[in-house]
Amino acid sequence: MWLAKIAGFVTSESTPGDGVHVGLPPHWRSVAWACGTWLAGRSVLLGSSTHIHAAGLLPELSVAFAPESLVEEAEAQALVPPASLALRWPGELPALVLDGAADLMHYPDRFTPVSTAADSVCLRDLAAEGAAPAAPGTTAATVPSGARPTTLTRAQLVARVETAGASTGAGNRSASRAVLVRSPDTAQMLQEVLVAWRAGRTAVVLTPEADDDVAAAAIRQEGITA
C-alpha cells in the first residue's frame, strides 16, 4: 500500500529530474520511499543536501525528517514524521512543503509499475564510504575506499542482491522467517532488505539509535535465529 501511494505521490508532485532525494537514515520509511520511487520509474539519491549540491544534482523531489535536511532547489519537498506509526507531520509545515505521510493518503493503494530500462540508474549513494554489501543482519565488510559503487543501474542492483543472497545463504529454509537489519548506512540497509525479501523473508529494520536492548527484544519477538 505505502509503495503504491508513494509512487503516485512522486508521479503527481514532480517531473523526472536527477532523481528523488531520500534524505532519510535507515528506517522503514526510507525503504518505502526508495521502493516507491523505483515503482514510479525514478532514481533514488541518497546523501545530505550538501552531498547533492556538491554533485551538482537537481532532484525533482526531496524527502527528509527535518526541514534543514531538504534540498531547497528541488521541484517539490516533503517532510516525513520520524515516528514509525505517525500518520502526519507533527507540527506546522514550512511554506510549500508537503506532508510526506498525510498527503500520501490521497493516492490509490495500487500503482502500475513504470517500465524502465535495466541499464537506467536507480540508485546514487552520494554518501558512500566504501562499505561492502553484507548479509542481512551482519556487519558490512571493510573494503578499500571507493570500492563500493556510488551509482547503480537497475540491473546492477539486482545482480548485487542476487549475489549477496547466494553467498550468504539468505534463502536457507531452516532460517527464521524474519531477518534483523541493523546498519547505520541507508544504502546498505536497503540492499539488506532487498536480499531478505528476495529470499521470501521479512526484514525487521532497526533505526541507528536503537540500542542492544531494542535489538534483543526484536530478535526475541520476531523469533530471529539466523
Spell out what each predicted region is:
Residues 16, 30-33, 40-46:
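A broadly used, surface-exposed interaction patch
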Residues 42-119, 200-226:
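Structural core segment of the AMP-binding/adenylate-forming
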Residues 24-34, 182-194, 213:
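Conserved coil-to-alpha-helix start sites within the AMP-binding
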Residues 6-14, 33-37, 56, 66, ...:
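Hydrophobic, Leu/Ile/Phe/Ala-enriched alpha-helical segments that form helix-helix packing faces
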Residues 2-22, 51-54, 154-180, 225:
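ANL superfamily AMP-binding
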Residues 36-40, 189-202:
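Conserved short alpha-helical elements in the N-terminal third of ANL/AMP-binding
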Residues 22-23, 181-182, 204-208:
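Glycine- and other small-residue-rich loops at beta-strand/loop junctions that grip anionic moieties
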Residues 84-180, 184-186:
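Conserved pre-ATP/AMP-binding loop-to-beta segment of ANL
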